[in-house]
């Protein structure tokens, strides 16, 4: 009897304690799950915490435009980046009808692809190609079509699915581009290039038409900061980050022979440093909690190789800085599986080995050469391709220097050609002049190619120095007289402007 009374008293006492403690403001006590596991892992009896729904989440449509501006298996990484971005956005709830994809689509089924029909963007990554819509592929991946799509102008689109950003004043737009670039230009697999001022004018026109509420733009390319430096307005409700500043390269990563390395059967880089940084950040955080600013900071640290800038670049930002306070889900969507992920936590400070964007093509060709059978015709052909590519690079470099000597004299040429304007200044005063000088050069000396895009600042400086069209023609003819451009003649490659 006494034992029964004691047990009853003890039980009532425990219940009293539990009832009392549940009302005390003791941090972490009973109010928390006391989950000993990592964030994002729940016990079977637990339910995910409800996510607050913002008013903004009920208004407007999220749009995305994804652009891979290259072609060829050596540029595998650009299409891998874009396919990965598509999968991320779809998991975030963006509808296929609101995501428009530009990619040449010559990678997945390429004879050099060791995994036919599959594209990966990480050494241990899953296929990111499956389900990606073929909106604008092959010859339809052009700057002109991109402009028409952004403006929602169906009548101006040539080929492709015909999808355009038919957005309304309360909609949000996310634009992501990955490819080669140069001062003032972004590459396209079908020439001409995208020129900065043309692109900015399209953005201004979209804003003037009330075509969106806010826009976020991410750009992966060499010298990508030059696309916006000095010409990006702050009053058009657009926030931009770029993989590099106006003067430096961006970087390929997950490359053969480097760490982290792709699976051994791959001969090409799987991704780009800035691109994998933002996507892997988005996949590991709750985008209802993480802000645009937090992602910018994380990506900036990782792309700089953790502030060493040893084979890293300076991630830059332009446009309306107030957008940085917005939560990322407003542009990239929200994956319910990430509900208990942290809002942001830095990756381990593990520098990644990378290759300069402009050298990635040679790195790829060298991998093919090393893996070819000794003495085979294939090995000889690849070696000749490498020699031809290096020879054309050398020709471009020496021709530009000689043209400078002819225009300004040997003593002044280098200083003028390599001149860099003050931060905040546009690359060139007359963008029409820039295009004209590029066409004159390519007519005489051959196509710039992905490598030669680096000389765009030289052309800009020639324009800024007041050189006439006639003087440029005379200098180019003298510098490249007798040169046979062969496969790199603009009649084969097209003009870059």
From Swiss-Prot:
The record marks 269 as: Required for post-translational maturation and enzyme activity. The active site is at 180, 222 (nucleophile). Its EC number is 3.4.22.-. Residues 1-31 form the signal peptide. One of its GO terms (biological process) is proteolysis involved in protein catabolic process. It is an enzyme of class 3 (hydrolase). InterPro entries: AE (IPR043577), Legum_prodom (IPR048501), Legumain_prodom_sf (IPR046427), Peptidase_C13 (IPR001096). This is Vacuolar-processing enzyme. It comes from Ricinus communis.
């Amino acid at each position: 009897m006494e034992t029964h009374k004691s047990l009853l008293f003890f039980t009532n006492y425990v219940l009293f304690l539990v009832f009392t403690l549940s009302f005390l403001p003791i941090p972490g006590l009973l109010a928390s799950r006391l989950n000993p596991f990592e964030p994002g892992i729940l016990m079977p009896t637990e339910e995910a915490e409800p996510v607050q729904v913002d008013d903004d989440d009920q208004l407007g449509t999220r749009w995305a435009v994804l652009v891979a501006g290259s072609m060829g298996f050596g540029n595998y990484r650009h299409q891998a980046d874009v396919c990965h971005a598509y999968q991320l956005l779809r998991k975030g709830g963006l509808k296929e009808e609101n995501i428009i994809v530009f990619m040449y689509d010559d990678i997945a089924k390429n004879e050099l692809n060791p995994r036919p029909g599959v594209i990966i963007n990480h050494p241990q990554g899953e296929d990111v190609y499956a389900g990606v819509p073929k909106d604008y592929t092959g010859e339809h991946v052009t700057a002109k079509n991109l402009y028409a799509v952004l403006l929602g102008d169906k009548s101006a689109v040539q080929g492709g699915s015909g999808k355009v950003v038919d957005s309304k004043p309360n909609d949000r737009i996310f634009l992501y581009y990955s490819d080669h670039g140069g001062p003032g230009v972004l590459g396209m697999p079908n020439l001409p290039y995208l020129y900065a001022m043309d692109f900015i004018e399209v953005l201004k026109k979209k804003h003037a038409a009330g075509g969106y509420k806010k826009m976020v733009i991410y750009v992966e390319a060499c010298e990508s900061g030059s696309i916006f430096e000095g010409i990006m307005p702050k009053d058009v409700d657009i926030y931009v980050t770029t993989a590099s500043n106006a003067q430096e390269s961006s970087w390929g990563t997950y490359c053969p022979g480097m760490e982290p390395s792709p699976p051994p059967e791959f001969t090409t880089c799987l991704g780009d440093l800035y691109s994998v940084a933002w996507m892997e950040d988005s996949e590991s955080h709750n985008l209802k909690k993480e802000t645009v600013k937090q992602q910018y900071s994380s990506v900036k640290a990782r792309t700089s190789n953790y502030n060493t800038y040893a084979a890293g670049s300076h991630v830059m930002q332009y446009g309306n800085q107030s957008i940085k306070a917005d939560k990322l889900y407003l542009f990239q969507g929200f994956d319910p599986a990430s509900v208990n992920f942290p809002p942001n936590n830095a990756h381990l400070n593990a520098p990644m080995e990378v290759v300069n964007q402009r050298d990635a093509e040679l790195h790829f060709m060298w991998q093919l050469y090393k893996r070819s059978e000794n003495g085979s015709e294939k090995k000889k052909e690849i070696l000749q391709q490498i020699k031809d590519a290096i020879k054309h690079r050398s020709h471009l470099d020496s021709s530009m220097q000689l043209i400078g000597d002819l225009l300004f004299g040997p003593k002044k040429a280098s200083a003028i050609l390599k001149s860099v304007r003050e931060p905040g200044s546009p690359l060139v005063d007359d963008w029409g002049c820039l295009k004209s000088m590029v066409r004159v050069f390519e007519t005489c000396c051959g196509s710039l190619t992905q490598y030669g895009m680096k000389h765009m600042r030289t052309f800009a400086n020639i324009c800024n120095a007041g050189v006439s069209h006639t003087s440029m023609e005379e200098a180019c003819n003298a510098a490249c007289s007798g040169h046979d451009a062969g496969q790199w003649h603009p009649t084969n490659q097209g003009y870059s402007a």
